[in-house]
Amino acid sequence: MNPVRRAALVVGLVLAVLVMVFATREAVRDRMTTHLVGAVAPPVAGITLDGTVWDIDDQRGRWVLVNFFSTTCVPCIEEHPELVAFAEVHDGSDPAVPEVRVVSVAFDDRSSAISRFFGEHGGGWPVLPADTGRIAVDWGVVAVPESYLVTPSGHVAAKVVGGVVREDLEGLLNRGLAAVAGDRTGS
């Protein structure tokens, strides 16, 4: 086989493999599961960017959305307006809408980059910088963004791998609310 044909064959094979990898990547990510759903949420605690102490255990009685992100992650940047919109609707100002506390945990970022990111993109919720220890490990975070919806009793109701969409978060919250209501009525 002449060298030009061999090179073309190698390039073609490499491209075919890349297409297969990227074509199936999203499907694999969507099927990722976690042992945490239904379990008590692992610890999320630390000093936030604004210097206050935040601990998920202090949020018992409230819904919490724990979001793992990075300021350099494109899907994290793309999901951020969705998180902002969700947080604004669920800020507790409307008694007809369930309150959900959002907390973000930065993944491998500097505090200055995180502050700049939130300054540019909005979001008034607590943010734990990357130096908070083993939080991502305890939650089993594989890649950012990942988000977890936690019930008022402190149990993980759902995991979202990849960027969130507000409507999907609303659906997860509604299913969680229905499950909690079912638990209360014994059904």
Model-based region annotation:
Residues A41-P42, V64, V144-P145:
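Short loop/turn microsegments at loop-to-beta-strand junctions
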Residues W54-I77, L83:
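Short active-site neighborhood of thiol/selenol oxidoreductases, capturing the structured segment around
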Residues I77-H121, D131-D138:
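Structural microenvironment flanking redox-active thiols in thiol-disulfide oxidoreductases
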Residues L65-N67, S104, L149:
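Hydrophobic beta-strand core positions in alpha/beta domains
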Residues R116-G124, A130-S187:
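Thiol/disulfide oxidoreductase modules built on the thioredoxin-like
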Residues M1-P43, T185-S187:
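N-terminal targeting signals for export/organelle localization
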